[in-house]
A protein has these predicted regions:
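N-terminal secretory signal peptides that target proteins for export/translocation
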Residues: 1-13
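Serine residues within intrinsically disordered or low-complexity segments
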Residues: 5, 28-30
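Compositionally biased, low-structure terminal segments
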Residues: 10-17, 33, 76
C-alpha cells in the first residue's frame, strides 16, 4: 500500500512531466530558429537571380499573364511582366494574389516600394483572401519597423520580428529589394537582399494558399512595383 508521501511524490512528478510536455508542445508549434544577425550574405544558389532570372530548372514566371491573377484594376496593373500597385489615401488594404494556391515552394522576387516613412507592403504567402482588403495568412513584410519580419494577418500577428536596426541596413528604401522565400511544411525561411531574416517553424499557420502582395492604407500615396516573380513548387 502506498503512503501519502508516495502519492504526493507521484503527483509532483506528474505535474513536472506535464510542464515539460507543454513546453515541448509549444516549441513544436512555434519553434524559433535564429535569423542572421551578422548581416552576412548567406543567400543559397537557388535564390540568386542572373539578369533578373532565376537559376536552375523548374521555375514558373508568375507575371507572364494577368489572367493568372486576381486584383482590382483601380489599384493594380500588370504589364510587361511587371505588377504595379498604387494607393492614394484609401482606408482599406488592397491585395493582389494568384488564382492558384501553393503549399510547399521556393519564391524569388524583386520588389520596390516608393512612399513616405510610413509606407508599408508585403510579399504574401499562403494567404486565403475573403475580400479585396482581407487576406488572412503570412506576409514577409516591408516598411519601417517591419522589414524582414514575418507577419500573420488576422491570426498570430507578428510571428518573427527582425530587428529594425539591422533591417534598415539591409533594406533599400525607394529601390529594388530582393526576397527569396522558402515555405516547406510549417517551416518558413526568407532572405532580404541576401541576408536571412526569417527562420521559423510555425505550426499553427496555413499550409496552403495564394501568393500575392499588399497595398497598405496610408496617409500619403504609396507605389509598389514587382518584377522577376518566380515560383518553384516542391514535391
Amino acid at each position: 500500500m502506498k503512503r501519502v508521501s508516495d502519492y504526493q511524490f507521484n503527483f509532483r512528478f506528474y505535474r513536472f512531466g506535464l510542464i515539460i510536455v507543454l513546453v515541448i508542445g509549444v516549441h513544436s508549434i512555434s519553434g524559433y530558429a535564429q535569423p542572421d544577425m551578422t548581416l552576412k550574405n548567406t543567400l543559397p544558389e537557388s535564390g540568386k537571380l542572373v539578369n533578373d532570372n532565376p537559376t536552375g530548372k523548374g521555375w514558373t514566371n508568375l507575371l507572364s499573364s494577368a489572367e493568372e491573377w486576381n486584383f482590382e484594376n483601380a489599384f493594380w496593373q500588370l504589364n510587361n511582366n511587371t505588377l504595379r500597385g498604387t494607393i492614394n489615401r484609401e482606408k482599406e488594404h488592397h491585395y493582389s494574389y494568384t488564382k492558384k494556391s501553393y503549399s510547399d515552394f521556393e519564391l524569388v522576387v524583386l520588389i520596390k516600394m516608393v512612399g513616405d516613412e510610413d509606407a508599408n507592403s508585403g510579399v504574401c504567402v499562403r494567404i486565403n483572401p475573403t475580400s479585396w482588403d482581407d487576406a488572412p495568412g503570412y506576409q514577409v513584410d516591408m516598411g519601417k519597423g517591419y522589414w524582414g519580419s514575418l507577419w500573420e494577418e488576422r491570426k498570430a500577428g507578428m510571428v518573427q520580428k527582425y530587428p529594425d536596426s539591422l533591417a534598415m541596413k539591409v533594406a533599400k528604401k525607394n529601390d529594388w529589394n530582393h526576397y527569396y522565400i522558402i515555405a516547406k511544411g510549417h517551416h518558413i525561411q526568407a532572405w532580404l537582399n541576401g541576408v536571412k531574416t526569417i527562420d521559423i517553424v510555425h505550426g499553427t499557420g496555413y499550409a496552403e494558399g495564394r501568393i500575392g502582395f499588399q497595398l497598405c492604407h496610408m496617409h500619403n500615396p504609396t507605389i509598389v512595383e514587382i518584377k522577376s516573380l518566380y515560383v518553384r513548387e516542391m514535391k
